[in-house]
């Protein structure tokens, strides 16, 4: 029978000092011997997705205490990618993921916690906590802060829905008036919560449902809705139940590595492909799999992308649907239900509710279960009132969206595309693969041959786009922006947004060893591996080279001979794989990250071989 980890610091005469300190935190005599459960919060006033989380930790803690556990809360950092975007702050975003994972490990192991409830929400916080959960392998439940309501404003006598990406694109268009930009800016982000489309934050929170590590509704229930409160309360109660099953009944099936198996990771990736989620999820799932000691690779993602169709298009891939619409259509359980009916997921994986995924779908899929209370849960909708308060409204749609022919979520027979929403491309430009979010690419340019125009940094690319250097037919190559080369693997939302604002969104392609915001759409290919700083062929491209992109055949190639490629490589080996004429201040902390970082195909995790 597993012994409580916390017994290390709470039992025995030699732990009298530790117990004295525990008592100083408020523990009573009868608390010793109970599981100590870490409530891992991420409240900050810097991030709208986290601004409402201040009281959530104590909400969960109270339920843990009622259920027979001892709750101890601590906080992690949280970076807002949208605020850090477009300047040096973005260099810190991806490294913060690993810092979060380490900080959770430090706190949990230093204090011998028995389990965790992870209160996450935005881009790098959920992945960082997921990496920690897989690393620590103690009972864990995720509960996120929830999505923001979609923005709404009246323009030209028409009510439109929008988000922060609309604000960025419109602001970059010189033909758009200041008045229109101001109206969009003030309406784009109306409430607390993670940005309202299927961007990275919401994609990752949805994926925790598919992994079985969060409760149904976690990825789609609005941050503002009163029903979301029950997810926090239930997480508090359920984590104590998981502790009992593991520590008292020796049931290891409740542990993260038993729930997040290879099959569960396939379920999560299949969901991501079906919903056209952020390409960043690939990076984070690969990283989490490595923490679990699992051999889940780019080739597995490629295999899944060839058989899983695109069943839903959500902002930024369309203006028609946002996360509130996904929830109305049955949320992630609805999407997984359609994948199940198509024979495309594993039903025998476990979930934190103590049932199989198949059993959970029987209970929570609105198509197979017509229970009135279930449908009421998924009718939870937006109020359209600006607020930073969680649980502040109780509005509901009149009906759920169960239209699987033309609705927000389709069945396989009526799929938006039989090609999935993400694809892995291989070729001499990316021998270890690169990622494109096909859900955001117009099918007319799935095959694209263009002329390379090369930039050594995101800043130079932005200047080139806005300065008119980039023309129709160009493949914009932005290199030395990978995990090692940046360092930090910046997101390229500004270059892609500016291409759209300049009328080049369907007339150009963009290739980078950096990554893209979940808000990106268009022919934007990221994660080119190996990256330039690690000797990748993207570092050998020259202005005027012809690049051939073939999404249907999953190929991307530089159209030069092998001999010419070898000659260029030999020349670059002599020069060193460094960006030319780039001025960038890099802090010591970022240099450390870059020194250890692997390329994107490995999840941009640290290279453990450097420590041997």
Swiss-Prot record:
Q: Which cofactor does it need?
A: [2Fe-2S] cluster; Mg(2+)
Pathway listed: Amino-acid biosynthesis; L-isoleucine biosynthesis; L-isoleucine from 2-oxobutanoate: step 3/4; Amino-acid biosynthesis; L-valine biosynthesis; L-valine from pyruvate: step 3/4
Positions carrying N6-carboxylysine are 124
Q: What is its EC number?
A: 4.2.1.9
InterPro entries, alphabetically? Dihydro-acid_dehy_C, DihydroxyA_deHydtase, DiOHA_6PGluconate_deHydtase_CS, ILV_EDD_C, ILV_EDD_N, IlvD/EDD_N
GO CC, sorted alphabetically, is: cytosol
Active-site residues, record numbering mapped to chain: 517
Question: Short name of one Pfam family for this protein?
Answer: ILVD_EDD_N
* Iron-sulfur in keyword set: yes
Q: Name one GO molecular function term.
A: dihydroxy-acid dehydratase activity
Q: Give binding positions for Mg(2+).
A: 81, 123-124, 491
Q: Which GO terms describe its biological process?
A: isoleucine biosynthetic process; L-valine biosynthetic process
Q: From what superkingdom does this record's organism come?
A: Bacteria
Cofactor binding note: Binds 1 [2Fe-2S] cluster per subunit. This cluster acts as a Lewis acid cofactor.
Detail which positions bind [2Fe-2S] cluster: 122, 195
Q: Which catalysed reactions does the entry list for this protein?
A: (2R)-2,3-dihydroxy-3-methylbutanoate = 3-methyl-2-oxobutanoate + H2O; (2R,3R)-2,3-dihydroxy-3-methylpentanoate = (S)-3-methyl-2-oxopentanoate + H2O
Keywords attached to this Swiss-Prot or TrEMBL record, sorted alphabetically, are:
2Fe-2S, Amino-acid biosynthesis, Branched-chain amino acid biosynthesis, Iron, Iron-sulfur, Lyase, Magnesium, Metal-binding
- General function of this protein: Functions in the biosynthesis of branched-chain amino acids. Catalyzes the dehydration of (2R,3R)-2,3-dihydroxy-3-methylpentanoate (2,3-dihydroxy-3-methylvalerate) into 2-oxo-3-methylpentanoate (2-oxo-3-methylvalerate) and of (2R)-2,3-dihydroxy-3-methylbutanoate (2,3-dihydroxyisovalerate) into 2-oxo-3-methylbutanoate (2-oxoisovalerate), the penultimate precursor to L-isoleucine and L-valine, respectively.
**Family recorded in the similarity comment:** Belongs to the IlvD/Edd family.
Q: Which NCBIfam families does the record cross-reference, listed alphabetically? A: ilvD (TIGR00110), PRK12448.1 (NF009103)
Subunit structure, interactors included: Homodimer.
Supply the name of the protein: Dihydroxy-acid dehydratase
Source organism (scientific name): Haemophilus influenzae (strain PittGG)
